[in-house]
Amino acid sequence: MNKKILETLEFDKVKALFEPHLLTEQGLEQLRQLAPTAKADKIKQAFAEMKEMQALFVEQPHFTILSTKEIAGVCKRLEMGADLNIEEFLLLKRVLLASRELQSFYANLENVSLEELAFWFEKLHDFPQLQGNLQAFNDAGFIENFASEELARIRRKIHDSESQVRDVLQDLLKQKAQMLTEGIVASRNGRQVLPVKNTYRNKIAGVVHDISASGNTVYIEPREVVKLSEEIASLRADERYEMLRILQEISERVRPHAAEIANDAWIIGHLDLIRAKVRFIQERQAVVPQLSENQEIQLLHVCHPLVKNAVANDVHFGQDLTAIVITGPNTGGKTIMLKTLGLTQVMAQSGLPILADKGSRVGIFEEIFADIGDEQSIEQSLSTFSSHMTNIVDILGKVNQHSLLLLDELGAGTDPQEGAALAMAILEDLRLRQIKTMATTHYPELKAYGIETAFVQNASMEFDTATLRPTYRFMQGVPGRSNAFEIAKRLGLSEVIVGDASQQIDQDNDVNRIIEQLEEQTLESRKRLDNIREVEQENLKMNRALKKLYNELNREKETELNKAREQAAEIVDMALSESDQILKNLHSKSQLKPHEIIEAKAKLKKLAPEKVDLSKNKVLQKAKKKRAPKVGDDIVVLSYGQRGTLTSQLKDGRWEAQVGLIKMTLEEKEFDLVQAQQEKPVKKKQVNVVKRTSGRGPQARLDLRGKRYEEAMNELDTFIDQALLNNMAQVDIIHGIGTGVIREGVTKYLQRNKHVKSFGYAPQNAGGSGATIVTFKG
């Protein structure tokens, strides 16, 4: 379809109305590329997809899609042989996760019959091994230790060397305390240094890395740690090399699947776009129209999507009707009506819902042409009439029986008599060629043409003579009438003058009286139709509300019953457990004889109801099914505490899992599903201390930034106690630099604590003097 009509009807602004409902960049790109088509099968497919998505939302009203970024460029780089960086891998990881979530959602979907959408859901690929490989990159853009054995080894050595450096420096802090300006370890140029008083600079052998602004403090790296620091620098280089190798290796593993991943991303975007269309339907009370095979258009209560508080109107453009001529004065909404028809057709042929009532029908047109508004060319020095006529001549050479034509103020800008004659001649030419046309004009001569000519119908926009304002209601079948005399009289013009003017009009040619009667009949019919529609809408709302309420009650009933059964079982188990403990205590005190204990326990058991058989409960069966591991599930390996992805199940029941670059064989008891872990309730504590194996993952830390001094000291005391209870070897305390009050308080507290083996500032790349690393005694 020609681009000019899309610009004239502001189709890009209409598409922008759908953007807030999109979740993916792929969906946004597909929306921006959306254009009308004349292929019936494509339009039908788009309509069917929207209807199925509506049915899906009935069962799953909170259906959503994981947000994803555009990856077309990333996949193209892979296909060209390039290696990806961490950020690009995270984009791919997100797409694979979104794909897997959609597959899981589809697998568990019930009570919805899908055909078109099923095709897209089932075309999504499953990449369990790649998902396992990509677990090596966490969301913060960090390569995990388990990405390779070599990386884990290097990082362990770095950690051990850094610990040695800290131990040496802590010993020197104690030995050389009188020579230091502060009893802390500082960091300069990435090296751990001691703040030595300038007068003692020659007493401590080592490398000078910095001098304070006052010159009183010299920052010296002691000779004892220089070699260790050089080893750490070398290990850091090895770490960078190993990370680069991992990026190359995973790039090679992903490369053969680049096209499939790109295809998955497109499908995710397509499903997102369909979802956005349905969210628009819900928000704007839009509908999926029916498709006519013979260019018949029937729009019920149609509105212009870009006009605020637009008046809804009916338009009936039957199969045999060739032209609708809208007559009447300007500013009544004729042009808006013209654009509403054109824009509704463009939206429908683009596979979008329309702002109309149920039962609306649209046709299929290969082209839509329009001459709307003042498009005169200043460069060509064309008048308004010449500009319009140039455009119309061009259009008349292109239109055919498969076109829809919209003409605004046909014949305007020249002598009224000649303009009206030209307008009628153009309309007659279009009628004979059977080209569907909607035209607006203010020439009264065209009213007679509409009445006398077959397959042509008059129409007008209603005008309220009481308020002297247009109502913007479309009146099909009723030509526009002049209200000049009535308006002049209401505005205060002398009745004598108005009477003289009325007598000058030839009564034989005055059709205003007939038009007035037609208007009254049309208004009466519209009122009846509106009443019928109101009743239909109320019935429809009532039916939907009752159905929704019935389904909700059933679901709530089943949920509450299951909760009650589970709670009852828990209470009984707790009571029996407590009774056992009580009887055990009594027995230990020899207050009861053994047979009396048995009898007492039997009586307590009678208090417990029979266990309810929940084996046939569908909700519990579904929950149990969800908990069973399957290929593609994310897991946590219990012995290592690392994440991976299940890739296959062996004949003996064991599972193969991809954990970074390492493939492992595990029994079901050796791992937990990530989803199952997320479902467990997490107890909230004021201070959390996480016990971790040395060298693996982030260390436990406490952040005191922004705290008041008293509050910070209380939290520090609680934190240290928790760390000691959990047998922590080392913790981090982030206090910031600021005024130094909290930092000094932390230092004094640690100096007093008998469980602290050593402490010092963190490396420059881990917070420097804004953080303190604490090591506890064994």
UniProtKB/Swiss-Prot annotation:
Entry keyword set: ATP-binding, DNA-binding, Endonuclease, Hydrolase, Nuclease, Nucleotide-binding, RNA-binding, rRNA-binding
The organism of origin for this protein: Streptococcus pneumoniae serotype 19F (strain G54)
Complex formation: Homodimer. Binds to stalled ribosomes, contacting rRNA.
Residues binding ATP, per UniProt: G328, P329, N330, T331, G332, G333, K334, T335
Biological classification of the source: Bacteria, Bacillati, Bacillota, Bacilli, Lactobacillales
Protein task: Endonuclease that is involved in the suppression of homologous recombination and thus may have a key role in the control of bacterial genetic diversity. Acts as a ribosome collision sensor, splitting the ribosome into its 2 subunits. Detects stalled/collided 70S ribosomes which it binds and splits by an ATP-hydrolysis driven conformational change. Acts upstream of the ribosome quality control system (RQC), a ribosome-associated complex that mediates the extraction of incompletely synthesized nascent chains from stalled ribosomes and their subsequent degradation. Probably generates substrates for RQC.
A single GO molecular function term of this UniProt record: ATP hydrolysis activity
Record NCBIfam families: mutS2
The keyword Hydrolase appears for this protein: yes
Pfam families in the cross-refs: MSSS (PF20297), MutS_V (PF00488), Smr (PF01713)
Protein name: Endonuclease MutS2
